[in-house]
Amino acid sequence: MRISDTGAAFAAERHICAFPGVLGTGMIITSEKGIPQDAQDSLRRSISGYEAALSRFLPYSLVRAMGDPQGIAEHNGIFEFPEYCRPLFDIYDSLYEATDGRIDPCIGESLIQLGYSVPFDLIGNGPASSGPVGTAPGRPRSISAGATPAGFYTAGWRSIRREGATLYTRTPVSLDFGAAGKGFCVDLLSAQLEALGGGAFTIDAGGDLYFSTARSQYSQDSQHSQDSQHSHEAGDVRDPHRPHKSHTVQAGTRITRVALEDPSDSDTAIGICTIGRSTREPGMRGTALCASAPGRRTWTVRRPDSSLIQAHHILDALTGKPARDVEATWVYAPHTSSGMEYPTAWADGLATALFVCDPQHLYNSTPPEINFEFLRLLSGHPEGRTTAAGHSAENASKDASGRPAAHKARYTAQHSPGFPAEIFIE
């Protein structure tokens, strides 16, 4: 996703703090004021500590120890995670229930069986090669007819005993917190930055975005835009149990626009999302916008019958198979003063859940205080319906009204009424 601010605010977040390679994607923080070096060091330590606890890819992490019989013995089956992990585990409790078990941290072994393990970059993409597995890009990963190794944990998240931030298991279990974990780390870091009392900032962690609320000085010097919500009744999903909240951008609000990347072409956009960043109020958290798409993490898998399938990292935990029919998702969690202490974690987790769960079911099943809007692209399009078309984020073609022109393409867009974007669909 590409980000731009309007008016005087565009130059405001001109300080950049980068953390290359962290969380598997890297992170960039842009801020109104420079982040002091000691604060940068503190953020870096927080990220390192987070990965040491929850990364499935680090050999010394606590999560890795849970998947190793020797680790089970060394910890006597008791794994005390940092106390800040308690809310993350609570979120996974909710996601597990809301999706009827389709989002489950115990999916780790299924990912490993499909080839999403260390080092992932050795799996590669493209056609099969003749070399040994992992020695050349494109070599299909072979999977056996059996599923989980003997003695390995196969039950779901609810079957693991938990007390606060402590997990108990006597059987190896490969956990993966990728569905909401990156967003949760972003929320932890954003809380640290907000505690500094500095200026506005944005965190970009590989497509998981957190926008702090604007400071009062923006209320008079920023340009404003009209609400760019573009209604498409055929694709709307409405929540009958929650009041619909308008996300019209009000005067006096700082505006940030985000290009929504075409999942099959990173140089084009399928829409523009408009984020209103209100002046900060006591207790108010910022806004989150998270995207999920399998395109950058796909590889070829050879089945036991020697047939080849394309695999990716977004799995349905009930089947252990890659989700199908959904090409990309976005979830917007607007700023709020209560109920959404971890907006990026929720947006991240729900963006994943939309690959395996009906959006109306998610609205009905998530806690009522979780306020979110969504957009998802489905594969293909119904007969006779014009669907999303990719446009350059900077040079989208225009129709007579000045809007980006819509064309037939590969997707059908489905979204909630309050998703604050202009989608390039007629």
Model-inferred region functions:
Residues M1-E426:
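Mature catalytic core of soluble alpha/beta enzymes
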